[in-house]
Every structure is written in C-alpha cells, then in structure tokens.
Amino acid sequence: MAVVKTTGKKDFDRSKEHINIGTIGHVDHGKTTLTAAISTVLAKRGLAEAKDYASIDAAPEEKARGITINTAHIEYSTDKRHYAHVDCPGHADYIKNMITGAAQMDGAILVVAATDGPMPQTREHILLSKQVGVPKMVVFLNKIDLLEGEEEMVDLVEVEIRELLSSYDFDGDNTPIIRGSARGALEGKPEWEAKVLELMDAVDSYIDSPVREMDKPFLMAVEDVFTITGRGTVATGKVERGQVKLNEEVEIVGYREEPKKTVITGIEMFNKNLQTAMAGDNAGVLLRGVDRKDIERGQVIAKPKTIIPHTKFKAAIYALKKEEGGRHTPFFKNYKPQFYFRTTDVTGGIEFEPGREMVIPGDNVDLTVELIAPIAVEQGTKFSIREGGRTVGAGTVTEIIK
C-alpha cells in the first residue's frame, strides 16, 4: 500500500490508466502462485518488480474494526495500463476484504485448478464478487500441465465454469478463459509464460475502464492508519470520488458528532509521490496535526462540508435467498445485524413500514435503519447486511432521517 516515508522519492507515473484488480478462487487453486507469476513474467519485460510467492504469502495484517485481514498489494504494468493487484492468502480474509471494501476491484481474475474444477469457495467468491459489484472477471484455468492428454476433461471443467458464472449473472458465454500453469510460468517455462501474457492481454481488453467520478467532491474511505515518526499520521485507502491536491484542507468524518479538520501535507501511491490523489487511486495521505487516536478505519476523509455522519436513514434492501448464501428463515423487527459501509461495519436496528411483520429471504423491501454509531452516509450510499460471518442482504440509502 501507499506509505508516506521520505520526500526523496520518484514521482508516480500517471501516463497509464490505473486499474484495481485481484485474484479470487478456491484455496490451493494457485491464486498467490499466479500473482507471483504475473509480476515475474512482466518484470522480464521491465513492467513490474518480481515478487516471489513467500513475499506475497507473508502479507501484512490490516486491522478492519477489530478484524484482522491479511492482504498483499502489488503493482505491475502492461503496455496499456498500470494495475494495483490485491491477493489474500486466507479464505476468511477474502470474505472480509471483499465485504469491507479493502479490495475494491474494477475486475477480478478467477483462478480455478483444472484438476479440481469449481469448488465451494469458487462459488462463494463469484457470489461475493456479484454482491460487491465487481463488473467482470477473466478466468485462469490453472494446473493444465498436470492434465496432459486429458483435453476432454478440461473442456468439461470449462463448460462448468461458464455455467457457474452465468448462474450469478456474469457473462459466462463470453468470459475469457485462459488455460495455463502458474507454477510453470514462475519457473520460467516459455509456453506457460506465454499463457500469463495471454491472460494479461485478456484482462487489458475484457475488463472495462471504470468510470471514475472525478467531478464530485473528494471522498476517501480510511482503510488503515499508522504513524511515521517525525512526520505525523498517515491514512491509506481508495479514493472513491473527486480529487485532492497537496496542502488542501479536508475533514475526517464518522463515529463522532463533529468532523475533524486537517490539511493533506503528503500524498503517495506505491511509495511514489503524487501532487494529486484522484478517484480510483489507492493512496496514502499524510495529515497535519492529526493524532493516531483521532482517526480510524471506517471513517472517511472528505472535502469540507460535503458529507456528515448519520445514524438513522431509510433504505431499500434486498434480502438474499438461501441459494444465494442468505438466511434460511425470515427476520423480524427486533433483528440487529451488522451494516457494512465502505470499510466499516456497524450494528443497527431496523423498523419496518406499517403493515409489514417480517422480511422473507428473496424480498425487496423498504425499511428504516438506526445505527449505534454515526457513519458518513448520504442518499445513494450502498451497504451490505451481514450476520454470523455471512452476507444476508444488500441495500442502498434512500433518505436521511438524522
């Protein structure tokens, strides 16, 4: 992630479009090996710094409101784009990461071992991708080198993957599926290196350029916070909209009734200096006069007076069906789940519209939510509803009450 350390650094190169991407898929299907292979193959072309499996697997821990998430952020380029790539070693880390928005992906690479085919976590990650709004994914069918002469079996696995993607409303018929061997590519075998380059060509062409909200007021969700001795407090996260320049005044909003004003005195991405952070950037910002205790994950840094924290609002929600990973039973008016906004989760209570007694899985309903802590939300803010470690609903704020 972006870390602001010293000023004697190179400037970040903005000549290529910046895209956020990540590897998803079942445990041991080769996500981290593929991440290492992509960086290694592109490094040979001068487009990345090679990262080995161990450095990605020993990912730093990120604290998400008391939840530990291991994530590895690496960067690489193709001829067309600059990519920030997130990989999570643990399955639980993926779930938390995708839900809290730590890995806000413009697209995903789904890794499926051809030796196994789609497995339970393959299905779960596809479902989660749909829930959190990942628009498209490209498939890497891995471990092909272990299936020489088994062409028919590989064809069947490919059909199964396409059907699975279509069942979750992805375009299974047209999703690129690249057959390869991440380990073979990592070991420098030319036929498998070529497949990694083919994969990145597919990512370049199939994953659409996201529409960034540049003209809206600056807002960045705080993902992580740390102190740099002698310089101050740094917050990292993804810029959701707008842009901010060095020495601009901003506010830290959420959890408290009053926002805290501060000035941005440094901006970095991947250890390179920026003059401006803009929508889509995974940036680190140095904040003047802010103590470590004044800011935490789940708050937002925003242009002054553009967003305020709220506890009560009306929302339109969809309760996931049992088959979609939701509840098996209805919920009633004393239900108190967690509501996930951007990088934070807050417990809240619900009130139904008059005449409604319960919500059945599969229902689309309007209801009122009251959170136990004020959060920076506004009309149109999206959230998910979680309980006991699973997503049970998704919603949008329709009207602020207080």
UniProtKB/Swiss-Prot annotation:
GO cellular component entries: cytosol
Enzyme class, spelled out: hydrolase
Reactions catalysed: GTP + H2O = GDP + phosphate + H(+)
Renumbered residue ranges of the record's region G2: 66-70
G3, as annotated region: 87-90
An example Gene Ontology molecular-function term: GTP binding
Pfam family, one: GTP_EFTU
Chief location of this protein within or outside the cell: cytoplasm
Compartments, record wording: Cytoplasm
Domain tr-type G residue range list: 16-211
Region (G4): 142-145
Keyword GTP-binding: yes
Residue positions binding Mg(2+): T32
UniProt region (G1), positions on chain: 25-32
Subunit composition and interactions: Monomer.
Similarity remark: Belongs to the TRAFAC class translation factor GTPase superfamily. Classic translation factor GTPase family. EF-Tu/EF-1A subfamily.
Function: GTP hydrolase that promotes the GTP-dependent binding of aminoacyl-tRNA to the A-site of ribosomes during protein biosynthesis.
Protein name, as recorded: Elongation factor Tu
Source organism of the structure: Mesomycoplasma hyopneumoniae (strain J / ATCC 25934 / NCTC 10110) (Mycoplasma hyopneumoniae)
